[in-house]
Design a protein with these regions (language model features):
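Bacterial N-terminal signal peptides
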Residues: 7-16
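Bacterial N-terminal signal peptides that target proteins for export
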Residues: 1-7
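A generic "folded-domain core" signal
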Residues: 20-161
């Protein structure tokens, strides 16, 4: 059941991100940063990427990393029930989440702010998550190319009336 919920969330993020990107006429594949605005509970523009585990990881391994401009929170969505997620930008130390609810592990506001600055300036990040069944997703690498551009688009869209 949790796998279905995460898969549905992943599809919703990708579908809404692809529609937000339709001005360029391109759908966004995994491993690319996209901007999306959701109006369900008030305007919330996010920058997110679905990081595919690729051929060197377990079949179907993926994580979604998403930064909410409205809530100024960085979240890692896992396929399963998360216990903890961690992120490393370039050669900086690993930073871990303190809050996991279901498949979503969020960094607190201070860590989210610090990581946002690192993501804006960095070249590459690595994300991993430990799950309640003691399995591990990752470490999964992701380029930060395009993150800053999509973040600026999200900020402008968030401020639009």
């Amino acid at each position: 059941m949790n796998r279905s919920v995460v898969a549905a969330l992943c599809l919703a993020v990708l579908a809404s991100s692809a529609s937000a990107q339709s001005f360029g006429g391109q759908n966004q594949p995994p491993d690319q940063w996209v901007m999306n605005c959701n109006m369900e509970k008030g305007r919330d523009c996010t920058v997110s990427a679905m990081i595919d585990g690729g051929p060197n990881n377990l079949l179907g391994t993926f994580l979604i990393v998403s930064y909410s401009v409205a809530y100024t929170t960085l979240t890692v969505v896992v396929d399963g029930v998360g216990q903890r997620a961690a992120m490393q930008v370039d050669e900086w130390p690993w930073v871990s989440t303190g809050i996991c609810t279901g498949g979503a592990c969020s960094f607190d506001q201070q860590k989210s702010s610090d990581l946002l600055q690192a993501l804006l300036k960095g070249q590459r990040m690595v994300v991993q998550a430990s799950l309640q069944d003691d399995s591990m997703a990752g470490p999964l690498p992701m380029s930060l190319s395009g993150f800053a551009t999509q973040y600026q688009r999200a900020v402008r869209a968030q401020q639009a009336k």
